[in-house]
Curated annotation (Swiss-Prot):
This is Probable autolysin LDP. It holds the Pfam family CHAP. Gene3D superfamilies: endopeptidase domain like (from Nostoc punctiforme), LysM domain. GO terms for biological process: cell wall organization; defense response to bacterium; killing of cells of another organism. It comes from Staphylococcus aureus (strain NCTC 8325 / PS 47). Keywords: Antimicrobial, Bacteriolytic enzyme, Cell wall biogenesis/degradation, Hydrolase, Signal.
Length: 279
């Protein structure tokens, strides 16, 4: 009985084995499918390998070649013109590429750097030119100071000595009969002090030019020390005495009633040619 049972169990096991084998043959495509799927995935992974690499900080050509299973010679041949000095942002080809395109891709950062240097140098040159231009105003200021210094020398006056002239004149001198405090009153007294008396009845100042000529006094447009300067301007005219003739063409005079009634004053006349002078 034991042997019969053993045979029976063996038969059952053999039957199951044959049944599984037959079942596997009927569904053979399902068994092979995972193998085929893995093969296709490997092919796709190989075809999607990167063709370029962008340099980051810390990279070197040797490191890039090592990480992508290349030699340095291959990397140099794929990137004509590349040098060991690379910068972040440079694009390195990992496969053979057109030489012209790769040359432009590698060298363009270098050209930009050289252009940047030119741009930096230009402001420096312009700044140096501006410094040179600023020197001109300094010279102009120096010349102005020298010119402004000259008028101070011209303002020096040389004192003159009164010169007495003898003319054929008829002086009706009855003392100072002119109104007190007026310009005519002072001119009469000042001429008497200088020893060059004038008439007592010449009237208002605007008439002295005519009266002096009638009396025989020389009257002209040339000032001299001691001469009476006369003008008919104003309602009554005005007279005074020339105290000095200055080298710059001006004259210094003394007078009364110019700065106020009965006030004696002196001033410099810049345009002496507009007055008459009684010598």
């Amino acid at each position: 009985m034991k042997k019969s049972l053993t045979v029976t169990v063996s038969s059952v096991l053999a039957f199951l084995a044959l049944n599984n084998a037959a079942h596997a043959q009927q569904h053979g495509t399902q068994v092979k499918t995972p193998v085929q799927h893995n093969y296709v995935s490997n092919v796709q992974a190989q075809t999607q390998s990167p063709t370029t690499y962008t340099v980051v900080a810390g990279d070197s050509l040797y490191k890039i070649a090592l990480e992508h299973h290349l030699t340095l010679n291959q990397l140099y041949s794929y990137n004509p013109g590349v040098t060991p000095l690379i910068f972040p942002g440079d694009v390195i080809s990992l496969v053979p590429q057109n030489k012209v395109k790769q040359t432009k891709a590698v060298k363009s950062p270098v050209r930009k750097a050289s252009q940047a240097k030119k741009v930096v140098k230009q402001p420096v040159q312009q700044a140096s030119k501006k410094v040179v231009v600023k020197q001109a105003p300094k010279q102009a200021v120096t010349k102005t100071v020298n010119v402004a210094y000259k008028p101070a020398q011209v303002q020096k006056s040389v004192p003159t000595v009164p010169v007495a002239h003898n003319y054929n004149k008829s002086v009706a001198n009855r003392g100072n009969l002119y109104a007190y405090g007026n310009c005519t009153y002072y001119a009469f007294d000042r001429r008497a002090q200088l020893g060059r008396s004038i008439g007592s009845l010449w009237g208002n100042a605007n008439n002295w030019n005519y009266a002096a000529k009638v009396a025989g006094f020389k009257v002209d447009k040339t000032p001299e020390v001691g001469a009476i300067f006369q003008t008919a301007a104003g309602p009554y005219g005005h007279v005074g005495v020339v105290e000095s003739v200055n080298p710059n063409g001006t004259i210094t005079v003394s007078e009364m009633n110019y700065a106020g009634f009965n006030v004696k004053s002196s001033r410099t006349i810049l345009n002496p040619g507009k007055y008459n002078y009684i010598h």
